């Protein structure tokens, strides 16, 4: 039964009756539903990072974690038991999960990005928020594709995660999809930029088709670094995908290379941890995109600096970037393994600087 579209609000009751039966539903709320998909950095629990744990132990954190204005469906144990688990390869039409309100216990094991994002939507735009969290760690983009669907040179041949975590919600009216994935395709499938760009653009187009919305908002993260592993092919594929999407309205990508932290920070730093802790920054950048595109917030900045051109002047190369605000150059200690003042000759490579910055 489609009840149509209701204005943002809450605490409604619904009564359905017939001659022989009566059903009553209470505590109904209407708001904006966002789907959070991808792999472990999207799934990453709030209690898994230091700042998240500290927040949960404060009076203010506990207060914000108890609200009926944010509801969630957490699919972490439904339909797909980890990256290596077996699953029925047919669409899952029904699920036994239900919307739950936030409580401190539930918040601890929800997606940190989803937590910060939903709090931001609630506070900035006074909207009720529904979270559908479907991310699974260590998963490839192929697993999120409908089996047999193609885009460019890419064809999906798995369909497991799509069938069990995406398809069940395609009849649900949603506000948009937030995506953080690519690490597994960097270190395992070794996709090149062209292959991943086809897969990424195709995924966006297909999900919009499945939700019957040609401009369904879809925003995603461009990978940051992990140690010295070269993820530049996936990052470039993510960038090129923006050009291949059929309808470019309400599609966006942002980078994270500027929040890597110092090289010697250890756990939680993207230099040494594939799960960097700065999830609030990730959520803020998602918020800027949806704030600008969906909630028409003129103050929201949707992108970091985007490379435009280069020019060689004597012994200097001048790079030009497009950006809405003022640019700031980080100190070398923030992006170099070690500072090397020696000039690089034309025939040598300076190995003291981290690869593919």
Language-model features: locations:
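Cell-envelope and extracellular/periplasmic
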Residues: 1-357
């Amino acid at each position: 039964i489609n009840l149509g579209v209701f204005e943002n609000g809450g605490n409604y009751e619904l009564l359905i009756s017939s001659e022989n039966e009566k059903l009553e539903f209470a505590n109904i709320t209407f708001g904006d539903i966002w789907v959070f998909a991808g792999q472990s950095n999207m799934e990453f629990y709030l209690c898994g990072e230091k700042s998240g744990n500290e927040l949960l132990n404060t009076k203010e954190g506990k207060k914000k974690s108890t609200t009926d204005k944010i509801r969630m469906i957490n699919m972490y144990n439904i339909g797909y038991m980890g990256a290596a688990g077996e699953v029925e390869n047919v669409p899952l039409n029904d699920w036994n999960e239900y919307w739950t309100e936030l409580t401190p216990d539930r918040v601890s094991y929800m997606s940190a990005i989803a937590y910060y994002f939903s709090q931001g939507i609630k506070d900035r735009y006074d909207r009720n928020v529904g979270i559908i969290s479907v991310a699974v760690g260590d998963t490839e983009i192929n697993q999120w594709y409908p089996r047999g669907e193609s885009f460019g040179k890419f064809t999906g041949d798995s369909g497991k995660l799509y069938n069990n975590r995406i398809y069940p919600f395609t009849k649900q009216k949603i506000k948009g999809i937030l995506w953080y994935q690519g690490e597994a395709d960097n270190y395992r499938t070794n996709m090149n930029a062209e292959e991943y760009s086809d897969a990424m653009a195709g995924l966006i187009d297909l999900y919009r088709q499945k939700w019957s919305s040609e401009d369904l908002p879809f925003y995603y993260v461009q990978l940051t670094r992990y140690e010295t592993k070269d993820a530049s092919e996936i990052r470039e594929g993510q960038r090129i995908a923006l050009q291949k999407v059929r309808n470019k309205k309400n599609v966006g990508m942002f980078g994270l290379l500027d929040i890597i932290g110092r090289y010697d920070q250890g756990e939680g730093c993207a230099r040494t941890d594939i799960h960097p802790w700065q999830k609030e920054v990730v959520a803020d950048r998602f918020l800027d995109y949806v704030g600008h595109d969906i909630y028409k917030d003129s103050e929201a900045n949707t992108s970091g600096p985007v490379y435009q051109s280069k020019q060689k002047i004597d012994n200097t190369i001048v790079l030009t970037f497009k950006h809405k605000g003022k640019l700031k150059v980080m100190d070398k200690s923030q992006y170099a393994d070690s500072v090397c003042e020696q000039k690089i000759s034309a025939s040598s490579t300076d190995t003291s600087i981290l690869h593919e910055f």
